[in-house]
Amino acid sequence: MILLDGKKTAQDIKNEITAEVNKMKANGEKVPHLAALIVGSDGASLTYVGSKVKACELVGFESTLVKMPSTTSETELLKKIKELNQNDDIDGFIVQLPLPEQIDTQKVLMTIDPSKDVDGFHPENFGKMALDMTTFIPATPFGILELLERYGVETKGKHTVVIGRSHIVGRPMSILMGRKGFPGNSTVTLTHSYTKNIAQITTQADIIISALGVPNYLKAEMVKDGAVIIDVGITRVPDETNEKGYVITGDVDFENVSKKASHITPVPGGVGPMTIAMLLKNTLLAREQRKVNN
C-alpha cells in the first residue's frame, strides 16, 4: 500500500511556488496578492482562513484578511466583493463558505470577478472547466488531480466512483476524471444520497473519491483489492481522550480499508493540505494572467 502523502506533496508545491515568487522579486515584479473574506466568527472557518493567510506569507505572497460580522447584510457583502473586484492590487480572492442564512451564496459567487475567482466556483469558470478550457479549477479537486499525477496513479480506462455531488468537490471531480488527458480518461460513476446499493458500485471501482462528510462511511467490504482511495471527508468527532476534545476523521475506515487499497490518502495529512497548496497555485496563475492582460 502506498500512502498518498498530501502534506509532503503540498510542501513540494509550496517550495515550487516560493521559487517562482523569488524570481518575481528578483525581477522587480509585483508578487501575488490573495484576499480572504469571512463573514461571522465560526471557529472552524476562522482557523481555515487563518491557515490560508499563513500559507500566503510562507510562500512570499501578500495577503489580506477581511472580516465582517455575522449580521452583515447581503447588500453589504456584495458591495465589499465589488470593491475587491475593482482593487487592482488584489490578484485573487476567496469568500469563505458557509455564509450566514440571510445571504444568498449563489448570488455572492456570481458577483466575484471570474478572473479573480481563485476558488473556481463562478459559473463561468465551472463551465470552462466542464469544456476543458483553461481556467481556475476548484482547489480540492485540483489537489486530488495533482496527487494522482505526482504519484503516477493510472486513471486511463479505470472506473472511478465519486461519492458526493457537491459543487465544491464531487461534481467537479466527476467532470475532471472523465476529461481527456492525465489524470482523466476514466469512466465515472457519480453517487449520492439517493444512490441505491452503493456498495455494489464501489466494489467495482478502481478509484474511489469519497466526499460525503460521514465519518468512517467507506468500509473494507465496500472496496475491492488494489483500489485507489481518496478520502476528502473531514469531520470533527468528539473524543474526550484527545486534548482538543475531538479527532479529525475522514469518510474512510482507514485502518481496515488501507489493508486492501493500493494507494490511499490519510486524514489528516491527505487532501486537506493539497487544497491550500492549490489555492496558492491558482493565485499565482491569476497574477500571471493579470500580468499578461495588463
Curated annotation (Swiss-Prot):
Organism whose genome encodes this protein: Flavobacterium psychrophilum (strain ATCC 49511 / DSM 21280 / CIP 103535 / JIP02/86)
Protein's job: Catalyzes the oxidation of 5,10-methylenetetrahydrofolate to 5,10-methenyltetrahydrofolate and then the hydrolysis of 5,10-methenyltetrahydrofolate to 10-formyltetrahydrofolate.
Record keyword DNA-binding present: no
Family annotation (PANTHER family): C-1-TETRAHYDROFOLATE SYNTHASE, CYTOPLASMIC, C-1-TETRAHYDROFOLATE SYNTHASE, CYTOPLASMIC-RELATED
Full protein name: Bifunctional protein FolD
UniProt keyword annotations, A-Z: Amino-acid biosynthesis, Histidine biosynthesis, Hydrolase, Methionine biosynthesis, Multifunctional enzyme, NADP, One-carbon metabolism, Oxidoreductase, Purine biosynthesis
Subunit structure: Homodimer.
GO molecular function: methenyltetrahydrofolate cyclohydrolase activity; methylenetetrahydrofolate dehydrogenase (NADP+) activity
Residues given in the record as NADP(+) binding sites: 164-166, 193, 234
Reaction it catalyzes: (6R)-5,10-methylene-5,6,7,8-tetrahydrofolate + NADP(+) = (6R)-5,10-methenyltetrahydrofolate + NADPH; (6R)-5,10-methenyltetrahydrofolate + H2O = (6R)-10-formyltetrahydrofolate + H(+)
Keyword Amino-acid biosynthesis: yes
Similarity remark: Belongs to the tetrahydrofolate dehydrogenase/cyclohydrolase family.
Cellular compartments per GO CC: cytosol
Functional pathway: One-carbon metabolism; tetrahydrofolate interconversion
Documented EC number(s): 1.5.1.5, 3.5.4.9
Disulfide links within the chain: none
Gene field: folD
Superkingdom of the source species: Bacteria
Alphabetical list of InterPro entries matching this protein: Aminoacid_DH-like_N_sf, NAD(P)-bd_dom_sf, THF_DH/CycHdrlase, THF_DH/CycHdrlase_cat_dom, THF_DH/CycHdrlase_CS, THF_DH/CycHdrlase_NAD-bd_dom
GO biological process: L-histidine biosynthetic process; methionine biosynthetic process; purine nucleotide biosynthetic process; tetrahydrofolate interconversion
SUPFAM superfamilies: Aminoacid dehydrogenase-like, N-terminal domain (SSF53223), NAD(P)-binding Rossmann-fold domains (SSF51735)
